[in-house]
Amino acid sequence: MHVLILEDDIDLGQALLASLRLEGISGVWVRSLREADAFVAEAPDCVLLDLALPDGEGLERLRRWREAGYGVPIIVITARTALEDRVSGLDGGADDFLTKPFAMAELISRLHAVTRRHARQASE
């Protein structure tokens, strides 16, 4: 599995990348929407998407990707805890939504779950 991590926080980005590697999952970590657009074209198996980014709003990019037909599973990871943010993320096309701080084991489980669902839907 190959994951695109879009997270502007350096400590969290490095921790996510290291944790995924320990699980045998490869990944690319980027800190901006501009960088992410280049890697989205490489079709990762899943995207971990922060909402508050230095060059824009992750939710708006999520909606744009979905409108363009980008079907790769996307898990939103954010410090925003309001119900409206969770609903907006899921309605905007996220496959899952996880608020920070979170346990890495939970993220890994959710990552496997969304990629399994995606693979099952693709085979139907």
Name every feature range the model reports, one short phrase each.
Residues M1-A122:
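N-terminal/domain-start alpha-helical segments
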